[in-house]
Amino acid sequence: MNIDKPQISLKNISKKYGKHKILENINLDIYEGDFICIFGKSGGGKTTLLNIIGTLEEYDEGELICFSEHNPIRNEKESEVLRRYKIAYLFQNFALVDNMTVQENLNLAVKYSRSTDKKSIIKKALMDMGIEDKLKSKIFELSGGEQQRVALARNMVKPYEIMLADEPTGSLDSENKKIVIDTLVKLNKLGKTIIVVSHDKEFEKIAHKNYIIENGKLKQLEFAVEK
């Protein structure tokens, strides 16, 4: 684990939508094995910041350094490599293909794995998420909680070092919420870097570093859990 050099470094990142500056001079270093949660009001810039970290959205000012690569968002080829092999994204709306089966959705992700036994990787991910019996089910046949577990399994079968999670427990019942949180904690203990944006105060208890976005500014909160 490299604790000397950040995996991701944001330097004076700013972003506008029209005349409204939603992010202003954001500075954040993210290290391997971090578990970070970012809180804030709806529409306050949390998801925008997550998208910038994941190279899904451009910023107007500042500098983004990902795995020692300067400003990868300016180079689409570098951004694509990061998204395929370094960064996994757990979207709020799951981002699954509704008319495909669970297996077909996972096949889209596992193709980037260097393992020669991709079937075993899929089987283990589904068992870890407790949905191995849903392999042949279409996504639209599943509950919201089951879909989020499929989305997590999809990320687990692809190569990644950082997982970004946008409101991962927002629409889940208590059982599925516990499964998702426990899985994120387990992945973090295995060395994965986890970055969550959420309204869920449960993350206060498990994150190593907690932040809040207020009026476009990122502020670190005092409560946190040691690694």
What are these regions (language model features)?
Residues M163-D166:
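Catalytic Walker B motif of ABC-type/P-loop ATPase nucleotide-binding domains
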Residues E104-K119, D128:
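ABC-type ATPase nucleotide-binding domains, specifically the catalytic core motifs of the NBD
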Residues E63-V81:
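ABC ATPase NBD Q-loop/coupling interface
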Residues I8, L23-N25, L82:
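Conserved structural motif at the start of ABC-family nucleotide-binding domains
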Residues R84, S137-F140, V157-K158, L190:
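Conserved signature/switch motifs of ABC ATPase nucleotide-binding domains
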